[in-house]
Amino acid sequence: MRNPNRTANKRRAENEENVRPDTLIVANSRYGSSNQYTQWLIDRLGADAMSYNKQQLGYTSLYRNIIWVGAIRDAVISNVHMLWQNHHNFGLDGKKIIICGVGIGDPENPDYFNKVMARSGCGPEFCSRYILPGRIDQSRLRLIDRPQFDKFLIDSKRIYGEETHLLVNERAADNYNGVDARALEPVIQEILATRY
């Protein structure tokens, strides 16, 4: 991911750009789906981006729009709580904040959506919220992550209910890949609307 302070400034200088982008994307990815969505957002919006790092979250204060793209783990968008805990310190009140969770559940299922957002602490007064289709390839799981993923597949019934439990187990067995640039269109349009 691009460092918003160093790499992005160098890129703008090389392209003779004088204006700092208005949007920062914070990507929290372990296996690449969130990074793929982030790259598509960079390409479409000319945004800066950084990988999640607790010590560098203060960079969010430099931008008008913040897009958080993180994996959904046990119905929680990874590390988004750090943004909520520090939003006053970073001066994020009044800024456009978009939260995107990436997971293997059905983004169109309201029950799945509501459970993820409730557990992630994303209040509607705070931000726009989206769930993007992710992917799973169990052969790529690191050895340390396998027991946690197996536990998730069992616990998904308790966390999400029967319908989502059956779906995520089926998708896990099939090595589901739903990552799709078209899923970002509402996010892109929401940012573009702030530029008119």
Q: Where do the PLM segments sit?
A:
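FMN-binding flavodoxin-like domain, especially the glycine-rich phosphate-binding loop
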Residues: 9, 16, 48, 74-196
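N-terminal beta1-alpha1-beta2 submodule of the flavodoxin-like/Rossmannoid cofactor-binding fold
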Residues: 1-93, 185, 189-196
